[in-house]
């Protein structure tokens, strides 16, 4: 059975387990020992969608429970990865050692994801999972819109809804949904329940430590993000940039040392909407790393030409380079 690989963006990104193994064999200098199918090694800075379902011998019409969690909400570097995982309601996950991904060592997380990817064992047969990696560029593009800013909570909500919809579209009969909350849990639960009335929705804090299916989703998200970030680091051949969080001295030092005074950072891996990055580029009084640029606006003087439409202005003052219009 073939897993589905699509890009959330127009260009299709395709990878599979065999190509992942070949890439690792070819790159002997890589520190990556396991490349999950949810990571697009050839373009790790791009948004990417991945879906793997249960095996054909597992009935899709039986009741399923589904969990949702994310990784990388707070860092200034890399993608935010949302993951859903699902299994039959009567399949017991408790014996496999799932826990909140943040409480597990990285090697343990990778071992568990390897088990899930292996369709020859009972866990791999009964578990389906999907990830959506939202690139740093896409996150920043939404948050830096001139009008109708697309904040992180809305992006998270929409991604969660899209991922769950795709599971239903694949034929899985989801009857229980468990979500680690983003924002107030009550209003978020009501929102999801309205979208998915056929299931019982539970949204709560610390869901990743309360429900094994959310813990499983947490592992899928965390391993995907960690390896995707390392692939990005290797692709631009840069030194260790730490955890990617602004509180990490290695990360902030990397940002300061590697910023271009005009173009920012290479690799599309920095979230330009984060204060740490914005301060280095937009506040010369606080940082000497940037060059202040005066953007000339179009003349808004009214004319008598009522038939010619004004061409929209690209939001070029946004440093990350995404071409959206206002």
UniProtKB/Swiss-Prot annotation:
Swiss-Prot/TrEMBL GO biological process terms: DNA replication, removal of RNA primer; mismatch repair; mismatch repair involved in maintenance of fidelity involved in DNA-dependent DNA replication; nuclear DNA replication; ribonucleotide excision repair; RNA catabolic process
Q: Which Pfam families match?
A: RNase_HII
Which cysteine residues pair off into disulfide bonds?
none
Name any cofactors this protein relies on.
Mn(2+); Mg(2+)
Q: Which UniProt keywords apply?
A: Endonuclease, Hydrolase, Metal-binding, Nuclease
Instruction: Kindly list the positions annotated as binding a divalent metal cation.
Output: 69-70, 180
Does the keyword Metal-binding feature in the UniProt annotation? yes
Q: How is the cofactor bound?
A: Manganese or magnesium. Binds 1 divalent metal ion per monomer in the absence of substrate. May bind a second metal ion after substrate binding.
Query: In what residue span(s) does the RNase H type-2 domain sit?
Result: 63-286
Gene3D superfamilies registered for this protein in UniProt: Ribonuclease H-like superfamily/Ribonuclease H, Ribonuclease hii. Domain 2
E.C. number, please? 3.1.26.4
Q: GO cellular component annotations, sorted alphabetically?
A: nucleus; ribonuclease H2 complex
Which GO molecular-function terms appear in the entry?
A: metal ion binding; RNA binding; RNA-DNA hybrid ribonuclease activity
Q: Where is the composition biased (Polar residues)?
A: 15-47
Disordered: region residues: 1-47
The superkingdom listed in its UniProt entry is: Eukaryota
Give the NCBIfam families listed for this entry: ribonuclease HII
User: Any idea what job this protein has?
Assistant: Endonuclease that specifically degrades the RNA of RNA-DNA hybrids. Participates in DNA replication.
Q: Which family does it belong to?
A: Belongs to the RNase HII family. Eukaryotic subfamily.
Task: Please identify the protein, giving its name as recorded.
Answer: Ribonuclease H2 subunit A
